[in-house]
Amino acid sequence: MTENIDTANIDSMKHKTLKRTANRANKEVFFRRRKGCPLSAPDGTAPIITYKDPDLLSKFISECGRVLPARVTNVCRSKQRELTKAIKIARELALLPFVYHQ
């Protein structure tokens, strides 16, 4: 009765289970505690987001001129919207360039 078992099928099942557990183990490494938003401090020391401050806004723009996503900058959703609006206004008023030339 044991002669009828397909060994190739068992080997592939072992490989699948090992791969799945390896993926789970790797995922645990990437779950890190998220830091708070750098633009919203509870004690009131957070910078004010305005289009008049191109130095602050340029920290949230990539090298090619795009607005960096919130998952990269750790900015909360409401502050990300304010940043995007301020960057767009600053671009229209020529305080920030639309595209950075290399």
Curated annotation (Swiss-Prot):
InterPro entries: Ribosomal_bS18 (IPR001648), Ribosomal_bS18_sf (IPR036870). The keyword Ribosomal protein applies. It comes from the Bacteria. GO terms for molecular function: small ribosomal subunit rRNA binding; structural constituent of ribosome. Keywords: Ribonucleoprotein, Ribosomal protein, RNA-binding, rRNA-binding. SUPFAM superfamilies: Ribosomal protein S18. One of its GO terms (biological process) is translation. GO terms for cellular component: cytosolic small ribosomal subunit. Belongs to the bacterial ribosomal protein bS18 family. Part of the 30S ribosomal subunit. Forms a tight heterodimer with protein bS6. Binds as a heterodimer with protein bS6 to the central domain of the 16S rRNA, where it helps stabilize the platform of the 30S subunit. PANTHER family: 30S RIBOSOMAL PROTEIN S18, SMALL RIBOSOMAL SUBUNIT PROTEIN BS18M. This is Small ribosomal subunit protein bS18. It comes from Orientia tsutsugamushi (strain Ikeda). The gene is rpsR.
